[in-house]
Design a protein with these regions (language model features):
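Short, amphipathic C-terminal "tail helix"
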Residues: 154-179
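Structural motif
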Residues: 31, 59, 166-168
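Active-site-adjacent helical/loop segments in soluble small-molecule enzymes
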Residues: 110-113, 118-163
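Alpha-helical scaffold segments in soluble metabolic enzymes
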Residues: 19-22, 48, 52, 72, ...
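Glycine-rich phosphate/pyrophosphate-binding loop at beta-loop-alpha junctions
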Residues: 41-116, 170-179
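Terminal helix/beta-alpha structural elements that buttress the NAD(P)+-binding lobe
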Residues: 13-15, 54, 83, 146, ...
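Small/polar-residue-rich loop-to-helix segments that shape phosphate-bearing ligand pockets
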Residues: 1-55, 108-128
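Hydrophobic beta-strand scaffold residues
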Residues: 2-4, 83, 140
């Protein structure tokens, strides 16, 4: 493996077609992965998360960074299922980005529980994470999965999730980033 460090100025061009073409010419064997990993292959791979046995779930929840996982889940879901994403970032841009990647409408993304933004935490989130892990013996990390479950539990407490619904919560990992 060869790592090549680039300047901030070069990084600003990470999505420019000319810059990407230059990289492809310099490194013809390279596979260039976009920041966050969302591309057609990521969506295809994430669509394989759901199996025929998952057809009975009414609500499928996942954490959202750049939109690849949720888009794959949306593509694999059937119209009676709702896919609910919990964004690690503040802003409606993710809704726009995901809408560009799918024609389906059985999904939503909330940024209400992003706790200030990407990789940011609150004392409440960290307390929830600690209590959840102690009770359920499932490790979480503070960037994505803890925010998703914190938000889901808050929505259940507030009566926003129908208790009769059958839920599937996707734990997408990220444990290497634990503090």
């Amino acid at each position: 493996m060869h790592l090549e460090f680039i300047s901030r100025e070069q990084y600003r061009h990470k999505e420019d077609v000319a810059y990407l073409n230059e990289l492809k010419q310099r490194y013809p064997q390279a596979y260039i992965v976009p920041e966050g990993g969302t591309n057609a292959l990521a969506i295809q791979g994430c669509s394989e998360i759901l199996t025929p046995q998952d057809q009975d779930f009414d609500l499928i929840c996942c954490a959202v960074g750049t939109g690849g996982t949720i888009t794959g889940l949306i593509e694999a879901s059937h119209s009676q299922q709702h896919i609910l994403g919990f964004s690690a970032l503040k802003g409606d841009f993710l809704k726009h980005d995901v809408a560009q990647l799918t024609l389906k409408h059985n999904w939503s993304i909330t940024d209400e529980f992003c706790c200030g933004g990407y990789a940011k935490t609150t004392p409440e989130l960290l307390e929830f994470m600690q209590n959840f892990e102690a009770q359920y013996l499932i490790p979480l990390e503070q960037v994505y999965t803890a925010k998703m479950l914190y938000g889901l539990f808050k929505m259940i407490e507030r009566g926003e999730i129908n208790p009769q619904q059958k839920l599937l919560v996707i734990h997408s990992g990220g444990l290497q980033g634990r503090i």
